[in-house]
């Protein structure tokens, strides 16, 4: 899904400075916001054209995470959280979900697992098998989001067919300890740099609306920019019951759009994806994410919450006069221009999931 963030920019397109970003991040109303969105859209069109990439995911292992990330319902530390709890699903189910996402228009498909890192050799072997099958049986570009990882593990996954590695910074360094205390900001950087050293495409962003200031949103964008990542997923907090951040008030749609636009102007070459929380925080203004400079979004469900039906997401893209970007794997794409409706997408919801593990508090 993601090309190099160091691509040559068209004449006249240069990243804005941090100082300018700190000024523009406050342009959240009236003519100032309109001008900011117009500027971001012009940069998006000049650098990325009118194609939008969709990403699908599978929650391959859920719950019982030992970390204390304050936004996450999968933490075992939060008694009131209600995320599903189950062990790593099989490679066959991962591939089945990838086929489903591909038919819905996904260009990239990510295998996501809860926890600090993969805890067992068998889990790593399952992901390896799934990656080999994804490359053989689908056209999607395989991605994984498996927590903190070392170079030898990442190399095994790359050899199995991994194209992209996703690991969010989550927030600015100055705000990180307010979000998580069980691992450090620098540990996250180590994982990202290990993936980059292997030549994997990098996907790293975070969540806005976790109590950070507008200036810290810019600080966060500067840190992501300096890593030279290919894709920047921008999420907005969707407060989950039982988590320490359940009480936080959603940031306004205007704040969301201004942040996306500033990120686009700071990182013209990066692929910027508006992901989780867009339905809750933007509501009927979701269509404006592309005017704000985004050139990608999620299709289907999130990790522990429902997303829009795929046909609504594809329709949102098409209403803006944009088209879906196919994978770069050189294989025939299963998307035929008709994304499934909500009824089709959730047809298998009643089928049994893997046997849940008991919740250990």
From Swiss-Prot:
<keyword id="KW-0479">Metal-binding</keyword>
<dbReference type="Pfam" id="PF04055">
    <property type="entry name" value="Radical_SAM"/>
</dbReference>
<keyword id="KW-0001">2Fe-2S</keyword>
<dbReference type="GO" id="GO:0051537">
    <property type="term" value="F:2 iron, 2 sulfur cluster binding"/>
</dbReference>
<protein>
    <recommendedName>
        <fullName>Biotin synthase</fullName>
        <ecNumber>2.8.1.6</ecNumber>
    </recommendedName>
</protein>
<dbReference type="InterPro" id="IPR013785">
    <property type="entry name" value="Aldolase_TIM"/>
</dbReference>
<keyword id="KW-0949">S-adenosyl-L-methionine</keyword>
<feature type="region of interest" description="Disordered">
    <location>
        <begin position="331"/>
        <end position="361"/>
    </location>
</feature>
<comment type="subunit">
    <text>Homodimer.</text>
</comment>
<dbReference type="GO" id="GO:0005506">
    <property type="term" value="F:iron ion binding"/>
</dbReference>
<keyword id="KW-0004">4Fe-4S</keyword>
<dbReference type="InterPro" id="IPR007197">
    <property type="entry name" value="rSAM"/>
</dbReference>
<feature type="binding site">
    <location>
        <position position="65"/>
    </location>
    <ligand>
        <name>[4Fe-4S] cluster</name>
    </ligand>
</feature>
<feature type="binding site">
    <location>
        <position position="203"/>
    </location>
    <ligand>
        <name>[2Fe-2S] cluster</name>
    </ligand>
</feature>
<keyword id="KW-0093">Biotin biosynthesis</keyword>
<keyword id="KW-0808">Transferase</keyword>
<dbReference type="InterPro" id="IPR002684">
    <property type="entry name" value="Biotin_synth/BioAB"/>
</dbReference>
<dbReference type="InterPro" id="IPR024177">
    <property type="entry name" value="Biotin_synthase"/>
</dbReference>
<keyword id="KW-0411">Iron-sulfur</keyword>
<dbReference type="GO" id="GO:0004076">
    <property type="term" value="F:biotin synthase activity"/>
</dbReference>
<feature type="domain" description="Radical SAM core">
    <location>
        <begin position="47"/>
        <end position="278"/>
    </location>
</feature>
<feature type="binding site">
    <location>
        <position position="69"/>
    </location>
    <ligand>
        <name>[4Fe-4S] cluster</name>
    </ligand>
</feature>
<comment type="function">
    <text>Catalyzes the conversion of dethiobiotin (DTB) to biotin by the insertion of a sulfur atom into dethiobiotin via a radical-based mechanism.</text>
</comment>
<dbReference type="GO" id="GO:0009102">
    <property type="term" value="P:biotin biosynthetic process"/>
</dbReference>
<dbReference type="InterPro" id="IPR006638">
    <property type="entry name" value="Elp3/MiaA/NifB-like_rSAM"/>
</dbReference>
<comment type="pathway">
    <text>Cofactor biosynthesis; biotin biosynthesis; biotin from 7,8-diaminononanoate: step 2/2.</text>
</comment>
<feature type="binding site">
    <location>
        <position position="72"/>
    </location>
    <ligand>
        <name>[4Fe-4S] cluster</name>
    </ligand>
</feature>
<dbReference type="GO" id="GO:0051539">
    <property type="term" value="F:4 iron, 4 sulfur cluster binding"/>
</dbReference>
<feature type="compositionally biased region" description="Basic and acidic residues">
    <location>
        <begin position="339"/>
        <end position="354"/>
    </location>
</feature>
<feature type="binding site">
    <location>
        <position position="110"/>
    </location>
    <ligand>
        <name>[2Fe-2S] cluster</name>
    </ligand>
</feature>
<dbReference type="Pfam" id="PF06968">
    <property type="entry name" value="BATS"/>
</dbReference>
<dbReference type="InterPro" id="IPR010722">
    <property type="entry name" value="BATS_dom"/>
</dbReference>
<comment type="similarity">
    <text>Belongs to the radical SAM superfamily. Biotin synthase family.</text>
</comment>
<feature type="binding site">
    <location>
        <position position="143"/>
    </location>
    <ligand>
        <name>[2Fe-2S] cluster</name>
    </ligand>
</feature>
<keyword id="KW-0408">Iron</keyword>
């Amino acid at each position: 899904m993601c090309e190099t963030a160091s691509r040559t920019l068209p004449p006249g397109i240069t990243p804005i400075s941090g100082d300018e970003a700190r000024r523009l991040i406050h342009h959240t109303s009236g003519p100032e916001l309109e001008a900011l969105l117009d500027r971001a859209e012009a940069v998006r069109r000049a650098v990325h054209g009118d194609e939008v990439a969709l990403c699908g995911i599978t929650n391959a292992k859920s719950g019982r995470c030992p970390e204390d990330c304050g936004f996450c319902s999968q933490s075992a530390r939060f008694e009131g959280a209600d995320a599903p709890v189950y062990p790593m699903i099989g490679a066959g189910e991962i591939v089945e979900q990838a086929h489903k996402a591909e038919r819905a228009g996904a260009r990239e498909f990510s295998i996501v697992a809860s926890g600090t890192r993969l805890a067992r050799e068998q889990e790593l072997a399952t992901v390896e098998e799934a990656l080999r099958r994804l490359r053989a049986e689908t056209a999607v570009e395989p991605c994984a989001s498996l927590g903190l990882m070392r170079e030898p593990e990442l190399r095994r996954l790359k050899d199995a067919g991994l194209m992209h590695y996703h690991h969010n910074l989550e927030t600015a360094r100055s705000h990180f300890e307010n979000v998580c205390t069980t691992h450090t900001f620098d540990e996250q950087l180590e994982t990202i740099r290990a993936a980059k050293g292997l030549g994997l495409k990098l996907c790293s962003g975070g969540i806005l609306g976790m109590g950070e200031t507008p200036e810290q949103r810019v600080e966060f964008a500067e840190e992501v920019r300096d890593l030279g990542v290919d894709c920047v997923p921008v999420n907005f907090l969707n407060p989950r019951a039982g988590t320490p951040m359940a009480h936080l008030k959603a940031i306004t749609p205007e704040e969301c759009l201004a942040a996306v636009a500033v990120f686009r102007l700071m990182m013209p070459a990066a692929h910027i994806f508006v992901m989780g929380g867009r339905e809750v925080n933007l509501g009927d203004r979701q269509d404006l994410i592309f005017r704000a400079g985004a050139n990608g979004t999620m299709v289907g469900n999130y990790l522990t919450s429902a997303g829009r039906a795929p046909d609504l997401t594809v329709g949102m893209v098409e209403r803006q006069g944009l088209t879906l970007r196919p994978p770069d794997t050189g294989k025939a794409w299963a998307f035929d221009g008709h994304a499934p409706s909500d009824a089709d997408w959730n047809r298998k919801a009643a089928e049994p999931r893997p046997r849940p593990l008991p919740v250990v508090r």
